[in-house]
Swiss-Prot record:
Species this protein is from: Mus musculus (Mouse)
Motif, MREC motif: chain positions: 1-4
Record's protein name: Tubulin alpha-3 chain
Function: Tubulin is the major constituent of microtubules, a cylinder consisting of laterally associated linear protofilaments composed of alpha- and beta-tubulin heterodimers. Microtubules grow by the addition of GTP-tubulin dimers to the microtubule end, where a stabilizing cap forms. Below the cap, tubulin dimers are in GDP-bound state, owing to GTPase activity of alpha-tubulin.
Processing and modification events after translation: Some glutamate residues at the C-terminus are polyglycylated, resulting in polyglycine chains on the gamma-carboxyl group. Glycylation is mainly limited to tubulin incorporated into axonemes (cilia and flagella) whereas glutamylation is prevalent in neuronal cells, centrioles, axonemes, and the mitotic spindle. Both modifications can coexist on the same protein on adjacent residues, and lowering polyglycylation levels increases polyglutamylation, and reciprocally. Cilia and flagella glycylation is required for their stability and maintenance. Flagella glycylation controls sperm motility. Some glutamate residues at the C-terminus are polyglutamylated, resulting in polyglutamate chains on the gamma-carboxyl group. Polyglutamylation plays a key role in microtubule severing by spastin (SPAST). SPAST preferentially recognizes and acts on microtubules decorated with short polyglutamate tails: severing activity by SPAST increases as the number of glutamates per tubulin rises from one to eight, but decreases beyond this glutamylation threshold. Glutamylation is also involved in cilia motility.
Catalytic activity: GTP + H2O = GDP + phosphate + H(+)
Domain of life: Eukaryota
PANTHER family: TUBULIN (PTHR11588)
Known tissue expression: Alpha-3 and alpha-7 are identical but coded by two different genes, they are testis-specific.
Modified residues (N6-acetyllysine): 40
Site positions per UniProt: Involved in polymerization: 450
Subunit relationships: Dimer of alpha and beta chains. A typical microtubule is a hollow water-filled tube with an outer diameter of 25 nm and an inner diameter of 15 nM. Alpha-beta heterodimers associate head-to-tail to form protofilaments running lengthwise along the microtubule wall with the beta-tubulin subunit facing the microtubule plus end conferring a structural polarity. Microtubules usually have 13 protofilaments but different protofilament numbers can be found in some organisms and specialized cells. Component of sperm flagellar doublet microtubules.
Gene expressing this chain: Tuba3a
Pfam families: Tubulin, Tubulin_C
Active site (record annotation): 254
Amino acid sequence: MRECISIHVGQAGVQIGNACWELYCLEHGIQPDGQMPSDKTIGGGDDSFNTFFSETGAGKHVPRAVFVDLEPTVVDEVRTGTYRQLFHPEQLITGKEDAANNYARGHYTIGKEIVDLVLDRIRKLADLCTGLQGFLIFHSFGGGTGSGFASLLMERLSVDYGKKSKLEFAIYPAPQVSTAVVEPYNSILTTHTTLEHSDCAFMVDNEAIYDICRRNLDIERPTYTNLNRLIGQIVSSITASLRFDGALNVDLTEFQTNLVPYPRIHFPLATYAPVISAEKAYHEQLSVAEITNACFEPANQMVKCDPRHGKYMACCMLYRGDVVPKDVNAAIATIKTKRTIQFVDWCPTGFKVGINYQPPTVVPGGDLAKVQRAVCMLSNTTAIAEAWARLDHKFDLMYAKRAFVHWYVGEGMEEGEFSEAREDLAALEKDYEEVGVDSVEAEAEEGEEY
């Protein structure tokens, strides 16, 4: 079996975790107490869903997941919520005082007290796996726990499970709305620390998702539940091929092979279609071509940036539901003829396709309509450098005045870490810029220097 362990860190990670596991349970017909009436082989399991759930002798299905937060309130909601019986109490780990939006507290002072306990619990989950494939880590860039503790944990996972892949689902600070003033600091410190430990990081920006909820689902004031359910759908699409049998299946390492041309360029953009409310879906039937085109609309992306200003390096289309390869090929052929979508010249083909016959499931009473087919596109584009540039700019404005730095230094960090992290991100921006340059031009430029 190719099992995956999900690790949900901090408030954002835990709340997205709630949305994801709620959806997985619905998709597989697992009840909130872990029973699965449709599963006939009790205790034994090489069913596809065993990549995400382990089975006990009593026929109970337990998520292969760990929820960690440095303060208890958010995880307490899981402990008392609908799915409280689904998780083993040891999978829900909390500290006593939170990281207070401070990377240094999450990474050094408070994080280090709890990290060994967390690794111990992860080890227990890993021992239940026959062929552990890797880790999915859910966290935000802006919070103290999400930035500091997640990066500490990833460093330690690299030591303990060297070759296992680590994929991140990271909540990127929104351009306009902010939950903390020091988000740029935390984001840049955590990106610098995890850059070498993460194999692939899917970024999600709250504001982009707010806009999708407002525009496509007609929700005037989206709540985090609305956002997380939408993020849950995306995560579900990405992991569907690991949990179901499909026609063209994709596993974790396959994503990296197809999406990551260079180790540092590992931040694909996710786009999901169709995001549509029940009232609208009732009146229209969306074809494969329509949902495929929708993926190339910047409005449907999970991060605010414009791929029309950048170049695509790779593209992964993950379809689910009533989709046949013939339609997909036709849709992609049409897209390739459009001039708005530019690929880098060293990567001519660039489309990888996965098809899963399991139609998308929606949470009953949620905002999303039940549709026959959906697609999630993961694309590695140079446009995401815009997102980094935006963040770096905010970092520079604050750091020029050394604003708020004393909070970090007081927790045992050194100022040098800030400048080191900032230089690393400057290098990352440069990397993206160089990747997008045409290879012929690049050779000509190099020739002049010698």
